Curated annotation (Swiss-Prot):
The keyword Magnesium applies. Monomer. Belongs to the shikimate kinase family. Its main location: cytoplasm. It is found in: Cytoplasm. One of its GO terms (molecular function) is shikimate kinase activity. It comes from the Bacteria. Binds 1 Mg(2+) ion per subunit. The gene is aroK. One of its GO terms (cellular component) is cytosol. This is Shikimate kinase. Catalyzes the specific phosphorylation of the 3-hydroxyl group of shikimic acid using ATP as a cosubstrate.
């Protein structure tokens, strides 16, 4: 089976759904952010602070191309879709799933999370603007799932149905 790339904005449920799908399909799950942290030997927050977003995006593209294109669930960072080369790679080499969640619901989820470099609690308007600027890129995915106020079980049922279509 082709690899499944799970995309969506931060806080949409990519990691949670990736792990659940991994168990369901008996496929390994690989998190691009985690792999970048391992390879660079520093937290993403530190990469952003010390090297900037452009360097991080370069690491992200390199990591994406190094991952398996078969029999893996790949959970991506929220901004991976900003580069056309990444969107093209994922679409050509796997099934791309977009997990949508209302940005105001995400903001509530992330309110206390200090590990997200692009989420600033004080500036919800900028957060929503960033979300909207990525929307068209996310929508290029093969499969769209709205995770807003849904349980993992509901999301998984919908996702399995769409994967099997």
């Amino acid at each position: 089976m082709k690899s499944i790339y799970i995309t969506g904005y931060m806080g949409a449920g990519k990691t949670t759904i990736g792990k659940a799908l991994s168990k369901e399909l008996h496929m390994d799950v690989v998190d691009t952010d985690q792999k970048i942290e391992e390879k660079q030997e520093k937290a993403i927050l530190d990469i952003f602070a010390e090297e900037g977003e452009m360097a991080f995006r370069e690491y992200e593209s390199e990591m994406l191309r190094s991952l398996p294109v078969r029999n893996a669930i790949i959970t991506t960072g929220g901004g991976i879709i900003e580069r056309e080369e990444n969107r093209k790679w994922m679409k050509e080499n796997g099934i791309v799933v977009y997990l949508y969640c209302d940005p105001h619901v995400i903001a509530e989820r992330l309110r206390e999370d200090t590990t997200r470099p692009l989420f600033q609690k004080k500036d919800i308007d900028a957060f929503v603007t960033k979300f909207e600027s990525r929307q068209a890129y996310y929508e290029e995915a093969h499969i769209h799932i709205d995770t807003t106020n849904k349980s993992v079980k509901q999301i998984m049922n919908e996702l399995k149905e769409k994967i099997n279509e």
